[in-house]
């Protein structure tokens, strides 16, 4: 029962216990993580090709991901708008010129291309490709170890997290409203509650959530989680500039775990420098919770 939990948490914790001071080593780890994400998504695509009843399973993936992201985002937006009304976050910043949102979206969609390539190769049916699942398990353990090191050495201290009240509050609201959305999805999609809650715990970190859920629930749920969280990032990129004028909390919350990296430039240019600390704290908390919550619900 707890083997899946241990596979996720042990390498993550061991990595988190390792302090690194050399920036060169951290750059190497970041590059390795990028390559390993592509590798595991490639394995995910191969695993999809070996599914029985392939056509019906692909329709199930599309159905699960479309319903899931719609319900979760609606729950997030409702809760974050309520937060903004009760605890306003004033915006006095004049928006700067934004980075190309099309270029950012294409960068995200490259990961979809890796899954598609793996799927196409898997359709060849070569016998050795059936070991893709085992290969992804070993790669996942190393990836989680490196993620632990990355989280430990990203410059955030406990004091900084505690002091940034807005980032913490928005993160809590996102977690609670996402899990409520997960419960609703369990009812709508007729999924086990723990499966739906695990799918709701990706918070936009599609490269990790898809991998972890494939390991725990199989390639159908894992792929649905991947597209669910990828859609969250793409939607956030498109909505932030217009939304941030009305509700800064909602704009930040929609970014999920990506607010500390991928969507941070958009948040900074549209919301100002005072939004950066909250965005980093918010993204850090959610990034830390993704593997923990998924491991918990998977067990």
UniProtKB/Swiss-Prot annotation:
Lineage of the native species? Bacteria, Pseudomonadati, Pseudomonadota, Gammaproteobacteria, Enterobacterales
Its placement in the membrane is given as: Multi-pass membrane protein
Task: Give the protein's recorded name.
Answer: Lysine exporter LysO
Q: Which GO terms describe its molecular function?
A: L-lysine efflux transmembrane transporter activity
Instruction: State the PANTHER family in the record.
Output: LYSINE EXPORTER LYSO
- Which Pfam families does the protein's record reference? Lys_export (PF03956)
Signal peptide start-end: none
What is the role of the protein in this entry?
Mediates export of lysine.
Chief place where the protein resides = membrane
Q: What happens when the gene is disrupted?
A: Null mutant is hypersensitive to the lysine antimetabolite thialysine.
InterPro entries from the UniProt entry: LysO
The Gene Ontology biological process terms listed for this entry are: L-lysine transmembrane transport
Please provide one cellular component term from the Gene Ontology annotations of this protein.
plasma membrane
What is this protein's expression induced by?
Repressed by arginine, via the ArgR repressor.
Name its cellular compartments: Cell inner membrane
**Protein family (similarity comment):** Belongs to the LysO family.
Segments spanning the bilayer are: 1-21, 31-51, 58-78, 109-129, 131-151, 169-189, 207-227, 277-297
Q: Which UniProt keywords apply?
A: Amino-acid transport, Cell inner membrane, Cell membrane, Membrane, Transmembrane, Transmembrane helix, Transport
